[in-house]
From Swiss-Prot:
Location of region: Disordered: 26-54, 240-269
Recorded GO CC terms: cytoplasm; nucleus
Chief location bin: cytoplasm
Keyword terms: Cytoplasm, RNA-binding
Name of the featured protein: Embryonic polyadenylate-binding protein 2
Membrane-crossing residue ranges in chain numbering: none
Keyword Lipid biosynthesis: no
């Protein structure tokens, strides 16, 4: 049997307590909140948030207005920089160069024209080639088919009857160091070149040598081994013209190019 609860532990409610509970809903506990009060509080909180968001958006939009942008220091700096750049461009187009600058540029152009038309530089068609190198080439000869065992002293002794020799150069391979089989001989005067050319097709160390005047190497022009100068563009044009003018040769029916024997009608070009 459970003990009976006495009235001393749970006294009956008084009238004062009942009046307090009826006037104060919080004293009644969680179940005392009415639906009407809950629904009334929720919209009020949402309206406050919406009002705050509207205020923030209106504040940000107000910053983009021209009046507020003009008050911003960054906007003023960028605007001043743009104005300064425009002012510089306008004055650069309007204001001419000072007379001293124009006079100096004109004098420099005239000096360059005089230098190009002077008698000393008329013979040099390419200003990029040094004048000393051109003069040395005019006093030099090319010697081809030289024996690999020949020395500079032997070449100097062989060409010494033609005139005074300043320099003998034997070209060697830069990787192996072996001679390439040709040399250049520089004389003291141009008249010695004509005498050296007479030794063309003579025998030096048991080999027939080739002696020709040396030609200056200019930029943009290729030269063969004494085969003459020709530009790259002219050689390409000649090749294209020759390939277009050639007519294809037709092979008789039944003949084809085989591996073992070439057809007499086949031409690689």
């Amino acid at each position: 049997m459970w003990p009976s609860l006495s009235n001393e532990l749970f006294p009956p409610p008084t009238e004062v307590w009942l009046q307090t509970v009826s006037s104060d809903p919080e004293a009644q506990g969680w179940g005392a909140w009415g639906r009407t009060e809950k629904t009334s509080l929720v919209p009020s909180a949402g309206s406050d948030k919406e009002a705050e968001e509207n205020e923030d958006s209106s504040f940000l939009l107000s910053l983009l207005e021209p009046e507020n942008l003009a008050k911003s220091p960054v906007y003023n700096q960028e605007l001043e920089a743009i104005r300064l750049k425009l002012w510089t461009m306008e004055h650069a187009e309007v204001l001419p160069e000072p007379p001293s600058v124009q006079r100096k540029a004109t004098e420099e152009e005239r000096a360059e024209a005089r230098e190009l038309l002077s008698p000393e530089t008329i013979g040099c068609f390419f200003p990029g080639a040094p004048k000393e190198n051109v003069e040395a080439d005019h006093r030099s000869v090319y010697v081809g088919n030289v024996d690999y065992g020949g020395s500079a002293a032997e070449l100097e002794a062989y060409f010494s009857p033609c005139g005074e020799i300043h320099r003998v150069t034997i070209l060697c391979d830069k990787f192996s160091g072996h001679p390439k089989g040709y040399a250049y001989i520089e004389f003291a005067s141009k008249s010695s070149v004509q005498a050296a050319v007479r030794l063309d097709e003579s025998t030096f160390r048991g080999r027939v040598i080739k002696v020709l005047p040396k030609r200056t190497n200019f930029p943009g022009i290729s030269s063969t081994d004494r085969g003459g100068l020709r530009t790259h563009s002219s050689s390409r044009a000649a090749f294209l013209q020759g390939s277009l003018q050639r007519k294809p040769r037709l092979r008789p029916h039944g003949q084809s190019r085989g591996r073992g024997r070439a057809s007499p009608w086949f031409s690689p070009y």
